Amino acid sequence: LTKGEYFVKEGKVATQLGFVESGQLQFYTTVNQYDERTTYVSLENTFVASLLSYINEVPARENIRALTDSVIWIIEKKDVCNLQSQISAFKDFYIKLIEYQLCCIDKSRLDFITLSAQERYLQLQIQEPRLFQEVPLQYISSMLGISPRHLSRLRKVV
């Protein structure tokens, strides 16, 4: 994908699972037609999909866009299903992958409502330090649910 190109577009059914070999992909949704809210940024060696859309075959509620030129290995859902029925090890891998993604989403959801902005910031620094080295701070502040100004203050305090 080239910078700015979409892997998933809000309103379209996501039929692909991707693996990021290199680059950065931003998961975001638009609120009130103009306000982008970043939910995650994937770096290399991660899988990407709009899971709700991909699994349930419904229109995506989020966008996944390349923040940088990116190399993505893509597999169609029908091919994933075929491989699962043909290769038991692939099925086991796929189940573990989806379980891991669901746990990450659940943890993120709970952390967002139970932790303070400072606690979320510290946790993200520990769990994903590369984000702070590679991703523009505007996306990190959006992921944390705070303004760029608040993030700047947190960085000075911590």
Predicted regions and their residues:
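Regulatory nucleotide-sensing modules
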Residues: 1-18, 22
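Residue-level recognition of specific faces of alpha-helices
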Residues: 16-19, 50, 63, 101, ...
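Hydrophobic/aromatic-rich structural module bridging two neighboring secondary-structure elements via a short loop
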Residues: 31-37
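Cyclic-nucleotide recognition modules
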Residues: 37-96
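Alpha-helical bundle regulatory/interaction domains
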Residues: 79-95, 99-105, 110-114, 118, ...
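Phosphate-/nucleic-acid-contacting segments
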Residues: 115-158
